[in-house]
Each structure stands twice: as C-alpha cells, then as structure tokens.
Amino acid sequence: MAKEKGRFTIPGESGCEKLTLELADRWGADVVRDSDGTELSKEILDAGMDVYSTICIIRGHNDWAKENKDKLQQTFLATEPKTATEEELSVTLMADFFEEQFAVNDSPLAFSYWQVWDRTEGKLVEKELWKWEKETGKVIIQTTPWHRYSVSFLAYRIWEEISMYNHVTNNWNKEHLMPVEPFYLETQEYLLNWMEQWCKDHSATNVVRFTSLFYNFVWIWGSHEERRNLFTDWASYDFTVSDAALAAFEKEYGYAMTAEDFINQGKLHVTHQPAGKKKRDWMEFIHKFCLNFGGKLIDIVHKYGKKAYVFYDDSWVGLEPYAEDFEKFGFDGIIKCVFSGFEVRLCSGVKTKTHEIRLHPYLFPVGLGGLPTFSEGGNPTLDAKKYWVSVRRALTKVPVERVGLGGYLHLVEGYPDFVDYMEEISDEFRDIYHLHEAGKPWTNSVKVGVLHDWGKLRSWTLSGHFHETWQHDLIHINEALSGLAFEVEFLDFQEAKTTDLSRFQVLINAGMQGSAWSGGDAWKDSKLLECLTKWVYEGGTFLGVGEPSAVSGEDTCFRMAHVLGVDLDRGERICHGKWPGSEEISKRKPGLYLTEKDTGICLDEPEKPLVTKHDFGKGQGIYLSSFTVNPENTRLLSKLLVRNTDYDTMPFVTDKVEAECTYFPASQKTIIMNNSEKELTVKWKNLEGEEETAQLAPYETCIR
C-alpha cells in the first residue's frame, strides 16, 4: 500500500533541489515554503506541491524606507537613571542601547513627547530645565545634586528585530532591513500597491504566509554584549508606538498618552502585570488599526485567488487571535511555532479554518535557547524527540490540520537520524489527525477554569515560549493541562462576576502576588469574593497555587483564605498564635500558615509541592505551594482535579506516570504514549473496566 502523504510543509531551498524533493517524498510533504533569505527555484515550484510564500509586510522595503526615514517604526526608550553630583547633568541618549537597532527621533512632533524625570522625587522635570544637544547626542539637565534622572525619548527602529536575530544567529553579511510604519497614510498607500504587485509577480503561490502583520513583540537590545537583551516581552505593545499613532489616539480617545505611560518608571508594562485602563485602551486602538489595514491586504490576496495564513509569532502584536473580532481579518489559516503542548492548544483554539504547527528544532545552526542544534555539539534528533513528547500529548486532545518545519534544509545533511525521525513524526501526525477527523477524544466530566487578569485574550499562554516564562507556576500548569483529558477555559475576573460559574467544577488561580496571573487589585472587589465563595460553598473546587488571590491592605493576604484554609503572613501576624502544622508548612513557603483547624496537609514531600485541602460547604479549597511540570506533578494535578474519585480506577489512567493514554470513541482507538527515555510496560483500564497492556520503546507512540 502506498504511503500516505499530505498535511506537511517542507522548507525548500534553491541549490538544494534534489534534497528538497527527496525529503518531500519521505516526509510526505504536500506544501513547500521559502524561509527568510531563501528562494524557491523553478524545479521546486514545478514539483507538484502547493507553495507557501513568506512575506514580512513591514520589512524588505529598504529602497522606499531610505527615501522615507521619517516613516520607520518607533518606540519609547528611557536612559538608565543617572545620579547628579552637581547642578548640571549630561545624559547621552544612546549610551545604553544598540546603535544598530535604534536612532533618535527628534522631529518636532516626536520631541513634544520627550520627558525628563527626577526618579528620586518621582516628578516630571519642567522642559525649561533641560535641553537637547543634537550634535553631541546628549540631554543637558539642570538638576538637584544627588537626585537620579532619566530621559524618555522616541527612537526610530532601524533594524527589524527578527531579521536582526536571524542575521546575527546565521552570521549573515547582508543589508540591514528597516521596518516601515504602516500607521502613516503614505506607507499604507505604498504597501497596498506593493501587495498588489507582489500577487501579480507570484502566480505560483497558493498561500501567502504573513509573518506576521505589522508590529513585532518588544525586543530591546543593549550596547553591552554582556547584557545584550535589555527587555523582551512576547505580548507587549511597546513597538506599536509612533508619533502619528500617539496623535491619532488622543483624537479618538480624548486623552493623550505620554512617554511615562509606556516607560512606567523604567519598569515598562510587562504582560505579567495587570493591565490598567490606558494600556487596554492602547491595545484596543492598535488592534482596531491592524484589523482595518490588515483586512485590506488580505482582500488583495484573496482577489488573486490565493489564501492568506498568518504566523502567530514575531510581528503578531495587534493581531490578537483570541479577540472576539479576530475572524473579521479574513485569514484562512494560522501557523504557530511550538516547543510545548500549551502552544498546540494556543494554535488549535483560534477561530480559523486551518491550524498549522511549526515543529522544533528549527533548521538553524543554533536554537532559540542559544545551544547548538545543526552544528558541532548539537543533537537535533534528541531535541526533536523531547519537543515531540510535549507537543504530542496536546495533539491527542485537540485537532491541528497541518505540521511543518522552518529554516534551512541543507543543514539536515549529515544528520540522517534526524531525517528518519521526522519521517516517523510526520506519519504519526497524520494518524492522530485522522482520529480527530472521525470524532473527539474521550474527556473527563470535570471542566476546569483558569482565572487571571487577561482571561480569554491570553488563553493557554502567558507571554512567549516556555523557556521565556518558566519562572511562573501558571505556565507549568498550562503545560500539564494541555495533555490532560479535561475541558479547559480561561476567564478574567469580570467574567467570574457576571457569568454562571456552575459550568466549572474547578477554578485555578496561580501566580505571584500582584501579578496578572494571581490578579492583583482585582481581589479587592467584594463582588468577586461573593461570587467565588458562593460557588465553592455549592460544590466547586478553588485550586490556588503560589500566592493566589493575594493582595495587600486587606484583613488577609489571600482573599480566598477562608476557602483555602491557609494564608500568607507578610509580617503582620508574626506574633499571633497559629494552628498546629503552621510551623511545618512555613518551612516549605515562608510565612504560610493554617487559618483553619481542619485544614489538612495532604502532601509534604520535599521533592513535591506542598498540598493542603480545606472543605468549605459542599466544595473545597486546595492549595499548592508551587507547581513544576513533570510526570509526577502532572499526575498529582490530575488527581486533585477529580476530587472524591478513586483516580487509579478511572479509565485511561496509566499505571506509569511517564505514560499517558487518549481514547477516541468514534474510532474505538487508543493512543498510548511513552513520554520517557526508557522502555515501559504500561497498563490501563478501558471504559468497560477491563485492563489493557502495551509494551513501549522510549518516546514511542502506539495506536490500537
């Protein structure tokens, strides 16, 4: 029987025609794509595969950009605070920043947004007390000695960040690509004409792959190699700023955004902190612009009979695939690069026709983490196996229509075991897809809600890949949930107050005090506490992790302490008597103590998170001191979610924590996965309670 092909996208490369076509056959590719810096030859284009063509709409226009340097993208930057030792202080604006990435914008409109701050007093310095010396690149400030000062200014971005990263990583010697700002009408006119001509010139293209739209996630590089990365945040809107957008915002919203609204005392506004009204207004404003102008570009693509897919990374800011109006863009598909299971769920949950995941490792000499991949010291096959283990468990829970690779195909030469393993993965993926095609997988009756400040808008993600957000308990929880047999929904605090919570059996709140994930000042709302307290009393489970519901200025640190049966002492109760067991649990998390006599300490093993339980009415509060995703903790979480149930007798629960099962009733097929590097004999019970057994090699997938 001929091997099934399809649902796989391969990166092609001129000069590597033989390799491209050979691997397309082995991996079952039905689509070929280009990558940044590569082209597809006629031989590849005529090979019978559909063609994805990658465009980054805001770069690759250097001829136009050089003639219109005032139409480049911008951002606010702020100098590091500097201490005045005399009554005058000189601050060199670009001293802290990578001069190949930024240039000062001192146009009259841009200059009107500049600010100087006395950070010692927290006061804005009057404009009469400072001046800009263009010829020296310095701001001269009349100061109070021994106070610290910083300067906030608009800067042009003169090297598009993803191109900059690819350039440095791959040791390119090419012209630096400048990002153009589409907010200007002149840029819009140019880009619409360019898109029209591009479609005419690329008759062989079936799918235009937008990478992505207009604004990259913020990525500020510094002047010192030892601290090159000054700030990066995958979901931040810092790079959407321009003098034109600021002026238009003021006209539409009736108030002006200032430099300090973005700089925020030098802390900037990380996604991990709750968003205030100004930030949410700005996000809404930029999203509306992206939707309007992006829709015009997509209409042109459709006019030429091509499909439009968008990459859910890089210049994705303003796209907001989980916004209610995302479908109005008109995209035919979405593509997400994935390291982890939560990113599969993130991709699959977007309302569009086609979902495609881009597997890792990318075909780059060095991976995103900085370690060698397709170069000396790298082991791309082992990398692929470990990534696939995380991705696979989520793929068995939700459908994704396509899979593929990115990068430079010639790099796989010399790695035949990687080529073999990708052939195995592509076959596995198609098998899993067909099971979803026949019907949904079996799911536990427990529905889980994840409660935080962003709610649905940041479903499954926090702000970037796992290796960028690992410090947060919630990303570990999301990763664990991504492959478990539970329906999961993300909601914000307003929704928790205004919708029927009875659809949930469990609500999870996890994060550091003051973070967006814990909730910050949202917990000062008595209505929120009323709704959640009532819901737990009537039978719900509130599962708090880290510092859930934590806020200062109230009678308890954890506002749900009455439900959880534990609270956190920040020093106010250090002289108060406490229930037995408080001293023991405070060794695991300093300051933690029992608020109720009947709070049970269920698990206090050094290698696992502390777990406490407290009955409240018909429901209960469960507290975990922390959560790190691993097979043991994932099993623990699963058990906690199905309280009052003999977990080990439930269907499709394996006797080995390193293995997992997914059952597809319509096909009457079970997927058994070995998530470890060792051979396993795995047992589980089917729906009839009968025991089944499978012998699995390391990392193996078995479908039967």
What residue spans do the PLM features occupy?
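Structural motif
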Residues: 33, 209, 335, 505-515, ...
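A conserved amphipathic helix/loop scaffold
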Residues: 383-384, 515-704
